[in-house]
């Protein structure tokens, strides 16, 4: 058999002369050689050849049998497991000059590699097989084979005289020198380390220095580094996951000194992560990360290379191509910002720059300090493996630990290290019984194994190789077998065994071919020049390592899982590269270009937002491109074909121009990357709009409504105009039926309104949702507005549908108050403005300014000031010329400033008042809105909406007027819908004595029914009072009601009921009065006019009112609670009482006026007879009308009643009527002989003037609602009544009478003052104060009766005269301020018939608006004491001629005080 080792022998023998023999193994071999005193010389090769028996190398060497003599036949090579390389050395001695063929014959195959035992650490053993000398075979037979390894047999024998060889470590750690005997001159073999890292070749020192050699340290080979003190391997631990940990698992470089400085632009957590990542990629001995390593991390972010290049440019502040930690942290921070949507800054801010630079300076300073303090060279990543000798080599486990054929996984074993005594003995010579013994050629089986490595006590240490020369083993690198693939997928490099030996491959998967050693010349073989042929050995390679006994074979160590950003499958290298290539290939407009183009665009356009065609053309032509290119660029830019470009389109055009200039072709169609974002948004919006109608149409109309729960809604009509009109017509029919007199009731109609609210609201909403067409003409718009108003009016008003549980009178009161509020607030505001203007005018009057204001309301404008200054300057110049002193400009300006400041202060007060009024209005509207929502049961209305639609605030005039009309119409429709026609009520008669009044109802049931219906009627008429001319209407209605009440004085006095005035009876009565003036004057009916005088006693009306109250209470017990009943009935009682008094006074006054008109046309012959019947009527006429109309319409009736009562002391026949032109101011002399004073009338008049018994209607009561319907018509009728009397006015002032009995009350000063507060003074105040000084007929007889009454006496007498004077009549003065006596006095007063004409004139004036009771008069006017007079009254009294008026005879009452 060819032995490949034959070529090794010569190479080794040439170099073994100068080197000491070195055992290769973990522990020294126990070799049996010659005695130590054997001289060195020729026999040495023989002895060494004796050792060149087949030796088991590795752990658990195979048992070998050697014969006593070496045969020339080579034995089968026996190698350990995984013989990847020849870890042994063939010893040869070049000094003996042995034949090469001898060595070739006797050198046996050497076992290389190791077969680790499961209980021992790994070791690499090499056997030594010097070629034997045939001449020394007898001696060689006695030498026992030596096993190197762990489990060698302990049975060793000394052959012949050869002493037992000393155990020599065939590994790293040589046994201690004391094992060698003292007489040994041979130096021990130097241990050789096997593994990756070879030490420098060293010559073996001289023998005297052999004791100082340090043993080789075990070295670890492979991936999993084991500590020196090997502990049993543990299972693999899970590795940390994450982007940072994926790098950190490979190890952190903790040698980097990073100062503890905090970077403000990143968080502490981010800085810690970046530091960990930085340490994981920085190589040992460096403080910076290279560009290649940094690129691996930065590319994982997914950003395009262009952006990463910009980030690198910003971060590499030192321009060194490498990054320190602050620069690396800054790069990671910028990448995070870009991933979150931010842009890369063009340059770093100063703060960040300063932080990074200071951090770099701190790092440089720390490095300098470290270099100065370090004594040795800077550390490198390979310092721990590079040593001067072999002493620093670390133990190496070579390869993976295979699963042996014994079925027990082998533990990794450290070769070398520790004390020899601690190692387990190894059997040599025999091999443990294995299953593959048959595959080995064991040689002679008779040899006993020897214990090596343990140095047992039974054996003496044997010195081996005493005569041997120092030999070098394996100077030339040898590879036994093929170069196998290791378990890591990488070919392991050669390993030096020993000081100068190249490392040899051990372990691995590659099957080692059997090797044959034979004579061959290997002169200076270099690495990879293999001279040995690989030979297959008996053992098959198996994986080693800590793995369970399974078929699993790990090819590479586990790597950390990729987590974090950039580690998904979409960021794989293939996708990454493709995306980067695509993105880089796309043509885009960079942000730098956009900013540059936008700045340039600002120069082209200043105000407009678009670039016109001339600007662009001129700008693009400057590029020098031809016309075709420019046209193509323009067509690409002007996407919408508008002839102008916006910012983005302009930037696109500039980009294309520059691209063409740089050699890029102009695209025929814009790529998606160049389309402006605005255009993309518009296109997207267009697509959405195109697709939306289809989606809405696809939606089913009925949805998913269940058939069981579906209910058709009849009100849900289709939205076309025809159906809307049908809906409105249906609503109109409902309303017409509701407003007709045949409607069932108000409650039923209100419930109908409530049910129709929803449908009405729907139709109104549909109407408002109708689109407005601005293209219509004004006429069409007006027609549409008119039609819309009509439709709104035709819709039933749902706002009046109150809750049925709320009493109707409360709702009516609420509506009435709400109706009064707007006018009330307007009046308050107007009055406040007038007060403000009056204050300003007053201030200007008190402090006249030299500047005449020409502005509105006399305000001073700037032009006025300039004129005043110019005039002042002119005056100053003139004064300088003339020497006169004038006012300076300073005084003028100060005066102007004072005036303007005062006016401003007054206006500020007005503004504050307006704010207060506004606050009050808002609070009232808030309360009203909540009340209305409670009463109607609807949702809460906001305060602003309530003010807007109820008070009309914020609406235009036309809308406000329409709302007013709408409210008034709705109120009228409500009142007309349910008129009450009592079955037991007699129909009203047209004559004066048959107007519908409470006295017509004889029974209590009829009266109660009448009152109940009247109350309901008033509740329904609440809202009707609110209109534009409300006060005028109410005043005229009061006057008409007074005429109405005058027709039936007797019935009113007897029953004291409420009279419901009707328009038609009033008109008929007035026409009767005018047409037939002589009928009531006939002598056959003198007593009829006196009858209404008797019931004028003021005490009687309370009794019928109480009866009415009781009847009303009985009728309402079923409907209302006790508390509400009590309150309502109390209010109704008071109202009825007031109205009864009113009706009495008005009826008497009207009767007197009519009688006065009739008496003016009588003949003188009917004087006394007619006066007997009409005595009281003319007396009341002058008193009541002027007082009533000047003070209050409700004041007149009492004065009428008082005047109707005749004074005591008059004769029964009365005074004869005057024959002098029927002048009411003068009477006969015979009439002056009797007293015409009526104490009761005087007291009544006095109370009227004081406002004690008047029914003050301040706009918040409900008394005059019944008078509103006929207000306007009655106003005209009253005017008609007054006109004929006014025509007869001239005779009144023309013919004075010699004596007038009723003149004493001619002092009208107090009443004139009260009447003129809101109206112009009455110019016909007839009698001056001097008239009272003339003594009329003595009034002594009636005085005792007058004094007996309890009413206020004389001090209030002038007020009575005031009333008389205002009336313009010469009626006798009612000087007595007391109530009339209970028995009626005689009614014949001849002189009282005459003053009526004057009163009629005054009455006409009042009706015309010139009297005291004008349209602007207020019910709340305070009565001024009668003793106080005014200049206006005196002025009003002057026009009356007093010549010929006889003085009134002195009465028992002192004359009124003179005027002031």
UniProtKB/Swiss-Prot annotation:
This is Actin cytoskeleton-regulatory complex protein PAN1. Residues 1295-1357 are annotated as: 8 X 6 AA repeats of [ATVSP]-P-[LVI]-P-[SPQILA]-[VAS]. Residues 328-672 are annotated as: 2 X 23 AA repeats of F-A-L-[AG]-M-H-L-[IV]-[NY]-[DG]-[VK]-L-[QN]-G-[DK]-[TP]-I-P-[YN]-[EV]-L-[DP]-S. GO terms for biological process: endocytosis; endosomal transport. The modification Phosphothreonine is found at residues 241, 563, 985, 987, 1301. It is a peripheral membrane protein. Pfam families: DUF1720 (PF08226), EH (PF12763). It comes from Saccharomyces cerevisiae (strain YJM789). Component of the PAN1 actin cytoskeleton-regulatory complex required for the internalization of endosomes during actin-coupled endocytosis. The complex links the site of endocytosis to the cell membrane-associated actin cytoskeleton. Mediates uptake of external molecules and vacuolar degradation of plasma membrane proteins. Plays a role in the proper organization of the cell membrane-associated actin cytoskeleton and promotes its destabilization. The keyword Repeat applies. It is found in: Cell membrane; Endosome membrane; Cytoplasm, Cytoskeleton, Actin patch. Residues 1-56, 80-110, 117-128, 136-146, 973-988, 1076-1106, 1175-1188, 1228-1239, 1289-1298 have a biased composition (Low complexity). It comes from the Eukaryota. Belongs to the PAN1 family. The modification Phosphoserine is found at residues 739, 749, 995, 1160, 1230, 1233, 1261. Residues 888-899, 1253-1265 have a biased composition (Acidic residues). Residues 1111-1170 form a coiled coil. Gene3D superfamilies: EF-hand. Its main location: membrane.
């Amino acid at each position: 058999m060819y032995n490949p080792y034959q070529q090794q022998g010569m190479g080794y023998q040439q170099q073994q002369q100068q080197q000491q023999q070195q055992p290769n193994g973990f522990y020294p071999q126990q070799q049996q050689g010659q005695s130590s005193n054997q001289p060195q010389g020729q026999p040495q090769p023989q002895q060494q050849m004796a050792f060149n028996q087949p030796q088991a190398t590795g752990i658990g060497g195979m048992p070998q049998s050697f014969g006593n003599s070496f045969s020339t036949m080579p034995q089968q090579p026996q190698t350990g497991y995984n013989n990847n390389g020849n870890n042994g050395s063939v010893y040869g001695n070049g000094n003996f000059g042995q034949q090469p063929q001898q060595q070739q014959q006797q050198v046996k195959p050497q076992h290389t590699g190791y077969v680790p035992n499961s209980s021992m650490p790994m070791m690499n053993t090499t056997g030594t097989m010097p070629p034997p000398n045939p001449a020394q075979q007898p001696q060689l037979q006695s030498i026992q084979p030596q096993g190197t390894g762990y489990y060698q047999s302990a049975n060793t024998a000394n052959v012949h005289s050869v002493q037992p060889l000393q155990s020599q470590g065939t590994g790293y750690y040589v046994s201690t020198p004391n094992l060698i005997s003292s007489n040994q001159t041979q130096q021990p073999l130097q241990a050789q380390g096997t593994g990756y890292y070879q030490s420098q070749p060293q010559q073996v020192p001289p023998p005297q220095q052999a004791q100082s050699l340090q043993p080789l340290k075990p070295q670890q080979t492979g991936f999993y580094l084991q500590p020196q003190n090997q502990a049993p391997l543990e299972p693999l631990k899970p590795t940390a996951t994450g982007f940072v940990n994926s790098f950190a698992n490979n190890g952190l470089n903790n040698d980097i000194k990073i100062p503890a400085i905090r970077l403000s632009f990143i968080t502490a957590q981010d800085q810690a992560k970046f530091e960990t990542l930085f340490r994981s990629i920085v190589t040992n001995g460096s403080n910076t990360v290279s560009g290649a390593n940094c690129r691996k991390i930065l590319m994982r972010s997914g950003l395009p290379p262009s952006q990463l290049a910009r980030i690198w440019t910003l971060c590499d502040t030192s321009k060194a191509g490498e990054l320190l930690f602050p620069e690396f942290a800054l790069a990671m921070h910028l990448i995070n910002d870009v991933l979150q949507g931010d842009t890369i800054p063009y340059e770093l801010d100063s703060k960040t720059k300063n932080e990074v630079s200071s951090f770099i300076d701190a790092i440089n300073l720390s490095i300098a300090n470290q270099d100065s303090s370090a004594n040795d060279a800077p550390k490198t990543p390979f310092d721990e493996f590079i040593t001067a000798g072999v002493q620093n080599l670390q133990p190496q486990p070579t390869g993976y630990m295979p699963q042996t054929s014994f079925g027990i996984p082998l533990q990794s074993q450290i070769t070398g290290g520790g004390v020899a005594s601690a190692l387990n003995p190894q059997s040599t010579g025999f091999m443990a019984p294995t299953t593959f013994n048959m595959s080995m050629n064991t040689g002679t089986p008779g040899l006993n194994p020897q214990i090596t490595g343990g140095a047992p006590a039974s054996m003496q240490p044997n010195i081996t190789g005493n005569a041997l020369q120092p030999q070098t083993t394996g100077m030339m690198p040898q590879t036994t077998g093929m170069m196998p693939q290791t378990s890591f997928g990488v070919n392991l490099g050669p390993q030096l065994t020993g000081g100068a030996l190249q490392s040899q491959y051990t372990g691995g998967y590659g099957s080692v071919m059997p090797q044959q050693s034979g004579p061959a010349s290997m002169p200076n073989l270099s690495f990879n020049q293999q001279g040995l042929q690989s030979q297959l050995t008996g053992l098959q390679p198996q994986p080693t390592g800590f793995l369970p006994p399974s078929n699993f074979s790990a090819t590479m160590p586990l790597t950390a899982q990729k987590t974090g950003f950039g580690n998904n499958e979409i960021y794989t290298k293939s996708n990454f590269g493709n995306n980067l290539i695509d993105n880089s290939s796309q043509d885009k407009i960079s942000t730098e270009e956009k900013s540059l183009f936008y700045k340039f665009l600002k120069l082209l356009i200043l105000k407009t937002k678009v670039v016109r065609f001339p600007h662009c053309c001129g700008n693009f032509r400057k590029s020098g491109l031809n016309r075709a290119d420019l046209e193509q660029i323009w067509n690409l830019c002007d996407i919408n074909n508008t002839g102008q470009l916006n910012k983005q389109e302009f930037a696109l055009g500039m980009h294309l121009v520059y691209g063409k200039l740089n050699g890029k072709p102009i695209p025929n169609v814009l790529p998606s990357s160049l389309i402006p974002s605005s255009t993309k948004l518009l296109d997207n919006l267009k697509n959405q709009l195109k697709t939306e109608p289809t989606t809405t149409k696809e939606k089913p109309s009925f949805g998913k409504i269940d058939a069981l729960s579906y209910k058709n809604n009849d009100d849900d009509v289709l939205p076309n105009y025809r159906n809307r009109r049908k809906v409105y017509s249906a609503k109109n029919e409902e309303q017409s039926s509701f407003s007709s007199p045949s409607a069932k009731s108000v409650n039923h109609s209100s419930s109908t309104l409530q049910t129709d609210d929803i449908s009405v609201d729907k139709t109104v909403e549909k109407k408002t949702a109708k689109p407005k067409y601005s293209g219509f003409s004004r006429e069409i718009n007006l027609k549409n507005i008119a039609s819309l108003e009509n439709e709104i009016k035709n819709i039933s008003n749902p706002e009046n549908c109150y809750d049925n549980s709320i009493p109707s009178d409360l709702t009516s009161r609420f509506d009435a108050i709400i109706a009064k509020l707007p006018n009330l607030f307007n009046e308050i505001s107007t009055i406040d403005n007038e007060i403000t203007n009056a204050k300003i005018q007053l201030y200007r009057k008190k402090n006249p300014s030299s500047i005449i204001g020409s502005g509105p309301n006399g305000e001073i404008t700037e032009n006025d000031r300039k004129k005043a200054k110019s005039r002042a300057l002119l005056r100053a110049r003139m004064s300088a010329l003339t020497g006169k002193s004038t006012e300076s400009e300073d005084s003028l300006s100060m005066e102007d400033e004072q005036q303007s400041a005062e006016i401003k202060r007054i206006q500020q007060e007005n503004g504050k008042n307006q704010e207060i009024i506004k606050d009050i209005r808002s609070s009232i509207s808030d309360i009203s809105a909540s009340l209305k929502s409670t009463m109607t049961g609807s949702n809460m209305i906001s305060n602003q909406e309530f003010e807007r639609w109820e008070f009309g605030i914020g609406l235009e005039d036309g809308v406000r007027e329409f709302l007013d009309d709408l409210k008034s119409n709705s109120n009228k429709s409500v009142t007309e819908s349910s008129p009450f026609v009592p079955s037991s009520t007699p129909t009203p008669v047209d004559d004066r004595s048959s107007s519908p009044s409470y006295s017509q109802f004889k029974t209590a049931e009829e009266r109660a029914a009448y009152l109940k219906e009247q109350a309901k009627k008033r509740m329904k008429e609440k809202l009707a009072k609110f209109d534009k001319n409300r006060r005028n209407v109410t005043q005229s209605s009061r006057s008409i009601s007074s005429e109405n009440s005058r027709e039936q004085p007797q019935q009113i006095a007897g029953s004291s009921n409420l009279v419901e005035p009707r328009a038609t009876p009033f008109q008929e009565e007035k026409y009767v009065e005018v047409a037939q003036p002589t009928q009531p004057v006939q002598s056959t009916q003198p007593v009829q006019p006196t009858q209404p005088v008797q019931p004028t006693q003021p005490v009687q009306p309370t009794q019928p009112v109480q009866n009415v109250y009781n009847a009303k209470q009985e009728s309402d017990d079923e409907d209302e609670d006790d508390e509400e009943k009590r309150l309502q009935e109390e209010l109704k009682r008071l109202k009825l009482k007031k109205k009864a008094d009113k009706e009495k006074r008005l009826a008497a006054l009207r009767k007197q006026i009519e009688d006065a008109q009739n008496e003016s046309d009588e003949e003188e012959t009917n004087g006394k007879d007619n006066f007997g019947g009409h005595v009281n009527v003319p007396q009341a006429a002058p008193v009541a009308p002027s007082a009533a109309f000047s003070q209050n319409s409700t004041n007149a009736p009492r004065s009428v009643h008082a005047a109707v009562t005749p004074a005591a002391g008059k004769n029964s026949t009365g005074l004869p009527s005057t024959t002098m032109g029927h002048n009411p101011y003068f009477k006969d002399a015979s009439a002056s002989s009797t007293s015409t004073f009526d104490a009761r009338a005087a007291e009544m008049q006095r109370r009227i003037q004081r406002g004690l018994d008047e029914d003050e209607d301040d706009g918040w009561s409900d008394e005059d609602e019944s008078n509103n319907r006929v207000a306007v018509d009655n106003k005209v009728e009253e005017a008609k009544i007054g006109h004929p009397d006014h025509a007869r006015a001239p005779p009144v002032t023309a013919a004075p009478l010699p004596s007038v009995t009723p003149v004493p009350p001619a002092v009208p000063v107090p009443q004139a003052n009260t009447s003129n507060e809101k109206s112009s003074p009455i110019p016909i105040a007839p009698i001056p104060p001097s008239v009272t000084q003339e003594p009329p007929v003595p009034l002594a007889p009636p005085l005792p009766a007058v004094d007996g009454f309890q009413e206020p006496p004389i001090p209030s007498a002038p007020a009575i005269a005031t009333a008389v004077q205002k009336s313009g009549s010469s009626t006798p003065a009612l000087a007595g301020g007391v109530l009339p006596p209970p028995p009626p006095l005689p009614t014949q007063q001849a002189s009282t018939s005459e003053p009526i004409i004057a009163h009629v004139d005054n009455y006409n004036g009042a009706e015309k608006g010139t009297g005291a009771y004008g349209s602007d008069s207020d019910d709340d006017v305070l009565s001024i004491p009668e003793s106080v007079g005014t200049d206006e009254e005196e002025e009003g009294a002057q026009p009356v001629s007093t010549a010929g008026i006889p003085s009134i005879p002195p009465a028992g009452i002192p004359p009124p005080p003179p005027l002031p």
